[in-house]
């Protein structure tokens, strides 16, 4: 993790890298031709910054991607790139949790095979795919609060032959087909049509405009209409039957977005795509993507320093932090949802009201209680329990993260509200360790969606997370960040890099 803090007004800056080593980074020499009193005042405020700084608020995938694209697409610039993070770690909603010595994803968990930016980031940073099998649950049970209305087959024993595993997959496909019929293919076609349009955001620069508002960005790709109707409306028009929507589709949206099929169509389509095969994650945690991008961008990272206010000072913005420091920035990028952070803007900015959907992730080392599910044995409980949209069901999903033996497992429970100990005592027969995390994970989607501006003030105050009202995922954050970086470059005299690390030509090759 990069940790860089200003240590004084010198011509060099000492910085710490991931290994705890220090290096010297050359900065522009300072020429002192000012009155001594002014010089003393300047030296007494070592956290004041030059007015040509570019500042990013938030170190999650949106903020780190913005930093990366800005430095990757431009020639070396004299501006200092600062990234502010109010927590003590980078990654935003990408984080891990440790249970019994094992590490699991606590936030954004999976990456789709056609998430082309994130794929390239991982390759560029030398990050390996996780190989521990988390997220590979294929024993699905759909619970209605009283019984399992549908279940796939239990997985074959470890070490089973290729033929047995293929036969198992075939039988599960037949079970799904028997229950849901042609709606399975229509559901897949709906998700694939969305992905086909989304892939347009990887086109080369000559055929892909820079967008200054989300509406035009979505209309250009043909995705805007999906944000104006509910997922349920879209799927009915696509020919899906009511059983598929109320069971299978609902399970997927409750797991991925903690919401029902009344979410907007684009968010729903992204959710359906997130249930496909081939999903993967970064070994050691997806947060490493953000950390690596910030390091590659040579960003000055201010950990545990949140921004309290952003004021327009004419040719630059004054950012005041919760540590009492001020930073002068010609460009300011807000890369965190403004819905639950208290940043004061002067003059005020106007964005549509938006609620964030909180997902409570509860990690439990212990054993599920089969009687709670109307079963006689733990071995009868599916490894992924999805739930229907019914008022008396207290959780969205339960999944097995690791099975040490028949009496010792680690589970992840998603719910819309905190699960208290009395309820957990009913769901689990034993609990050795319990960890609770409350995430303002994504917007509460509704149709028609209304979008905040990308440019908040008509000048150089940008908001990456405005795109999140269309859909929220690691890749959508990266796509929105690339557009903001290109927008900044198009509006400032920044020279383009001759051979960026992430070129549009390479992106085209990935999609083939």
Where on the chain are the PLM-derived regions?
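Active-site/ligand-binding neighborhood in enzyme catalytic cores
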Residues: 181-316
